[in-house]
């Protein structure tokens, strides 16, 4: 079942790509829909079946292709498969106005398989293999329309990804020398005897891993691909790039720090200080850039730069409450940002408007879609009782409880400032959308609500953004258990 959740969508995707154009669009959508549903069902079967191990190949000391389903992997598996399927269903309608649907859905299926390979990876070699596959195979989702801007965005994403991959590979090379194993074990696998006398080198190795994975996570100074790639990609691709693929960089950091190097090894060192500093800088910088941005999808891309670093700041504190907040924000941000990008896609699909200034009265034209956008915005800002409030509360209390000089108070201040900026760049679309002013001419107003294929995923995501905040108990309890195992 585990291997099927990885191989089935990849094989189906390659079959779709090799087939080329389908005579019937319904055939393409049936294959894609069945593939997405079956893959998600298989992944959920793995999640519910308890811990599973599967060793495939070994190429030498610690160089194993190995899968292990642990509590962390299960959390990410649920998020990945839920959001990927919902965005895929939305794409059935959205991609009508794009050319070469077959290519999009083929790669969409293939990347789904690589993501399951990532969340179920049992060691860093396996993780790196699927991480590279994901990076390469997701490029066509960005440069789909082959415009000059799309090609630029896709190549920028690729080059940044390759640079990050080299940094991670550097780290793996040295970890293989100084670790008992490259398998993911809570607390880390470093061999104290081998590390003795090489502590400075190992700190560089740890930082190399963090920086390498920060490319996907969008942390400064390696964030620039995000605002270039998102505006040119189709909306479903933007939704999963921001909601899911960015999180694979986050998961890579978690596996590196908490399951290989060990949190205690970098605690109180320059690595932790630089990591916290870059994360906080990115939180503020991303919010400011989003606030100033006039293009709707680019504004949401800068928002992802900021919000993903909320997660990274929580992880960098190496503190239980902060890590709980970080993992909660992984879940909440995936849902919220997918909803926001799909809302933006709905506006573009129905009106062809991309600039924020052109959205006056949009709430009167498509009220359901804009209410979905509004609920997701409230959650991202952190307005109680929506989900974002819960994760940000844990992040702030974790920072205060950490006792780390400067960061224990600077962190909450930056998070609060960012929340205010988030309100400043998200809510005007709602306000101007529903209250366009007395000079707005609605005499020729035409309802432009999308059909159910687009609306149902939007409604589900918007509902989750609120319900997960109203009923956070089970999720928080599960995440607290994960954190207790690594800190």
Residues of each region from the PLM?
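Cytoplasmic/organellar membrane-interface segments at the starts of transmembrane helices
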Residues: 188-189, 233, 364-368, 419, ...
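Alpha-helical transmembrane segments and their helix-start/interface "positive-inside/aromatic belt" motifs
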Residues: 23-34, 152-162, 366-372, 451-460
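Select subsegments of transmembrane alpha-helices in polytopic membrane proteins
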Residues: 2, 240-249, 451-455, 459
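C-terminal TM-helix exit segments that contain a strictly Trp-centered aromatic cap at the helix terminus
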Residues: 38-50, 170-176, 250, 380-384, ...
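Transmembrane helix-loop-helix hairpins at membrane boundaries of multipass inner-membrane proteins
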Residues: 1-4, 11-106, 186-189, 479-486
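Hydrophobic transmembrane alpha-helices and their helix-loop junctions in integral membrane proteins
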Residues: 86-96, 102, 112-127, 137-432
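Hydrophobic alpha-helical transmembrane segments of integral membrane proteins
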Residues: 5-6, 217, 223, 381, ...
């Amino acid at each position: 079942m585990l291997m099927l959740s990885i191989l089935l969508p990849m094989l189906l995707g390659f079959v779709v790509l090799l087939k080329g154009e389908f005579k019937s669009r319904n055939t393409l959508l049936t294959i894609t829909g069945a593939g997405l549903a079956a893959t998600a069902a298989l992944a959920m079967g793995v999640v519910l079946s308890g811990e599973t191990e599967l060793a495939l190949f070994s190429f030498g000391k610690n160089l194993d292709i190995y899968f292990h389903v642990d509590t962390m992997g299960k959390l990410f598996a649920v998020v990945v498969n839920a959001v990927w399927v919902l965005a895929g269903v939305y794409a059935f309608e959205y991609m009508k106005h794009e050319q070469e649907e077959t290519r999009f859905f083929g790669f969409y299926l293939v990347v789904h398989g690589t993501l399951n390979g990532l969340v179920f990876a049992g060691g860093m070699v396996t993780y790196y293999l699927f991480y590279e596959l994901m990076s390469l195979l997701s490029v066509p989702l960005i440069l789909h329309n082959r415009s000059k801007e799309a090609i630029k965005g896709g190549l920028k994403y690729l080059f940044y990804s390759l640079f990050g991959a080299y940094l991670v590979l550097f780290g793996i090379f040295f970890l293989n020398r100084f670790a008992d194993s490259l398998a993911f074990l809570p607390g880390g696998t470093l061999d104290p005897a081998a590390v003795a006398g090489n502590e400075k080198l190992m700190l560089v190795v740890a930082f190399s891993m963090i920086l390498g994975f920060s490319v996907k996570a969008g942390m400064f100074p390696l964030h620039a691909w995000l605002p270039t790639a998102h505006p040119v990609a189709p909306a479903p691709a933007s939704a999963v790039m921001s909601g899911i693929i960015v999180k694979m960089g986050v998961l890579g950091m978690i596996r590196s720090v908490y399951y290989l190097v060990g949190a205690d090894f970098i605690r109180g060192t320059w690595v932790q200080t630089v990591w916290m500093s870059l994360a906080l800088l990115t939180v503020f910088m991303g919010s400011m850039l989003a606030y100033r941005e006039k293009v709707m999808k680019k504004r949401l891309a800068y928002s992802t730069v900021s919000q993903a670093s909320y997660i990274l700041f929580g992880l960098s504190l190496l503190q239980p409450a902060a890590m709980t907040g970080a993992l909660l924000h992984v879940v909440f941000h995936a849902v919220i940002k997918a909803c926001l990008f799909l809302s933006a896609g709905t506006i573009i699909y129905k009106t062809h408007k991309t600039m924020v200034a052109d959205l006056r009265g949009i709430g009167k034209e498509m009220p359901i879609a804009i209410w979905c956008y509004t609920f997701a915005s409230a959650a991202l800002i952190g307005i109680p009782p929506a989900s974002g409030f819960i994760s940000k509360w844990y992040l702030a209390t974790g920072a205060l409880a950490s006792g780390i000089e400067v960061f224990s108070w600077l962190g909450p201040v930056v998070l609060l400032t960012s929340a205010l900026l988030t309100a400043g760049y998200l809510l005007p679309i709602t306000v101007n959308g529903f209250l366009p002013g007395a000079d707005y001419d609605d005499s020729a107003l035409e309802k432009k609500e999308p059909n159910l294929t687009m609306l149902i995923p939007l409604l589900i995501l918007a509902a989750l953004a609120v319900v997960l905040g109203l009923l956070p108990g089970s999720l928080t309890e599960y995440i607290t258990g994960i954190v207790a195992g690594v800190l």
